[in-house]
UniProtKB/Swiss-Prot annotation:
InterPro entries attached to this UniProt entry: FAD-bd (IPR002938), FAD/NAD-bd_sf (IPR036188), PheA/TfdB_FAD_monoxygenase (IPR050631)
EC number: 1.14.13.219
Role summary: Involved in resorcinol degradation. Catalyzes the NADPH-dependent conversion of resorcinol into hydroxyquinol through hydroxylation.
Pathway this chain belongs to: Aromatic compound metabolism
Enzyme class, spelled out: oxidoreductase
Catalysed reactions, semicolon-separated: resorcinol + NADPH + O2 + H(+) = benzene-1,2,4-triol + NADP(+) + H2O
Record's protein name: NADPH-dependent resorcinol 4-hydroxylase
Keyword Oxidoreductase attributed: yes
Length: 530
């Protein structure tokens, strides 16, 4: 099919972080991408304020170093949940370095991150951002998806004579939020878990030093459940739960905001109130994430309460999971059927974080004092029985898809350590590279694989190296890879571009079998050696 038949390879509806990151990742691979944003200007208020170690690793794809970035910071306190008396009910580990090579938790100012994503996109010859373009129709044929749109700066009041325009793409991605036009057009239903709580969100810029207690914590006081967390460098976020019968419009007023902050010694003389808005926390997810040549991502596919700090993270995981699949398909290396595995994998993974977020929400969203007292007694006993060990949130697993179910660690998040490669000592991603990787413990996989396996690996641009002691191409400086593979009883490991484990293998024969299976799962075309 001639590329001249298309206006773009991928049309992304929605210019938030999920859509823009996807555009940048595809643009880096030379694919033509058009972002459609219905508003004439971008939203300049934060929604998310935090991301985890996995997202820090993903941001490395676009050159953002979360450890050394003036727009990102981190804190050393655990994420504590306390009752009205100040007793600890729950500790979540937000303090340590992880096996991803990054800290458990980072804090940022979302408008700044989004601007940097857009600025990067605008430097790319293959990425176009269209503001003031409202999608009003979506149609598909065998080879394309077409967005029917209206060019207007007033999407809520479209003029009768507004210019109409169609954009024909090979694929359409709906990254257009909770009220997704793309999802609704495709008839993809959302499963609603019946979780609804209204909270007042306050974003502040302190002008004086203020004592917050610990850096990030939850006050589980039935009289007013409250969240106190960073909002990125130089900013703070406060969240107050709306009580039963409370007028939400009045709650969101500036006067109400300062009244709620006053007991915390936060006053207009000590901080600038940048935003006051009531949000309804919900838990919903789409059962199907694809219909023909259209797919959904981010809030269009899933919503969760913010208590685990994973909402935006889930959307950025979607971006990378889609990007490497679309790259293989658009490059002609893989059949279109590969895209079916995207939703299958991501749906189960995001379920974990939705459930975990709801569990945390069920701890704090209690306004009945008797119920709160019973909760306190139970959770204090549970914490004492655990000797105060913080809750580990990093156990989510991919759903069925592109990973070997018979391998130890298949479908799990891969580890990353400090290595030395060709004279450079750094994290593996920065020293060796990102993408598919086949690593052998003190063994060069290229020396033991047959020609068909090597052709398939070369087709997907895989890194193929030995890792381990000084005899290996990649020196395992910290010993992480050596310990990891020995613990798995493996000599080889295959990892994916989104940093998940495809498989582990004990010997060359098993590795070759796994690579053949990988070729089949990726639907690699015969011209690339599958």
């Amino acid at each position: 099919m001639s590329p001249n038949n298309f206006d773009t390879d991928v049309c992304i509806v929605g210019g938030g972080p999920t859509g823009t990151l996807l555009a940048v990742l595809l643009g880096q691979k030379g694919h033509r991408v058009t972002i459609l944003e219905k508003w004439p200007t971008f939203y300049e208020r934060p929604r998310a304020v935090t991301f985890d170690h996995e997202i820090a690793r993903i941001l490395g794809y676009i050159g953002i170093d979360s450890e050394n970035d003036e727009a990102i910071d981190y804190h050393s306190d655990s994420y504590d949940w306390k009752n009205a008396a100040g007793e600890t009910l729950l500790e979540v580990d937000w303090t340590s370095m992880t096996d991803s090579g990054w800290r458990t938790r980072y804090w940022f100012y979302q408008p700044e991150l989004e601007k940097r994503l857009r600025d990067l996109a605008l430097t790319m010859d293959f990425v176009d951002i269209r503001c003031g373009f409202t999608a009003v129709g979506l149609s598909q044929d065998e080879n394309s998806a077409i967005i029917h749109g209206i060019v207007t700066d007033t999407p809520e009041n479209i003029p009768a004579d507004a210019q109409r325009e169609d954009i024909r793409a090979k694929y359409v991605i709906g990254a257009d939020g909770a009220n997704s036009f793309v999802r609704n057009s495709l008839g993809l239903e959302m499963n609603d878990l019946g979780y609804f709580f209204d909270w007042l969100i306050l974003d502040l810029k302190p002008t004086q030093d203020i004592d917050y207690g610990t850096d990030h914590w939850q006050l589980c006081d039935p009289k007013r459940p409250t969240t106190i967390v960073p909002g990125g460098p130089g900013r703070r976020r406060w969240e107050f739960m709306a009580l039963p019968g409370e007028d939400l419009k009045e709650l969101a007023s500036e006067e109400s905001a300062w009244n709620l902050l006053e007991p915390w010694d936060v006053t207009p003389g000590k901080a600038i109130l940048e935003r006051s808005a009531v949000y309804r926390f919900q838990a919903r997810w789409a059962q199907e994430w694809r219909s023909g040549r259209a797919l959904i991502a981010g809030d269009a596919a899933h919503l969760m309460p913010p208590f685990a700090g994973e909402g935006m993270c889930a959307g950025l995981r979607d971006s990378l999971a889609l990007a490497w699949r679309l790259d293989l398909v658009l490059s002609g290396k893989s059949d279109d059927a590969l895209l079916d595995t995207y939703g299958e994998e991501r749906r189960e993974h995001v379920h974990y974080y939705i459930d975990f977020s709801m569990d945390l929400g069920n701890v704090i969203c209690i306004t009945d004092e008797d119920e709160a007292r019973l909760r306190d007694e139970r959770m204090i006993k549970e914490l004492e029985a655990q000797d105060g060990v913080p809750v580990n949130t990093d156990v989510a697993h991919l759903g069925p898809g592109i990973w070997d179910k018979d391998s130890s660690h298949g479908g799990e998040l891969a580890k990353q350590g400090i290595v030395e490669y060709q004279g450079r000592k750094a994290r593996f991603d920065d020293a060796v590279g990102r993408g598919w990787a086949v690593l052998g413990l003190n063994t060069d996989p290229r020396e033991v694989l047959d020609e068909d396996s090597l052709v398939a690996l070369d087709a997907i641009g895989a890194i193929v190296e030995s890792v381990g002691d000084a005899t290996s191409a990649v020196l395992d400086v910290e010993g992480l890879y050596t310990r990891w593979l020995k613990e798995a009883g493996a000599t080889f490991i295959i990892t994916r571009p989104d940093f998940y484990v495809y498989s582990t293998a004990v010997d060359a024969e098993q590795l070759q079998t796994q690579i053949k299976q990988l070729s089949d799962l990726l639907h690699l075309n015969s011209v690339v050696g599958a």
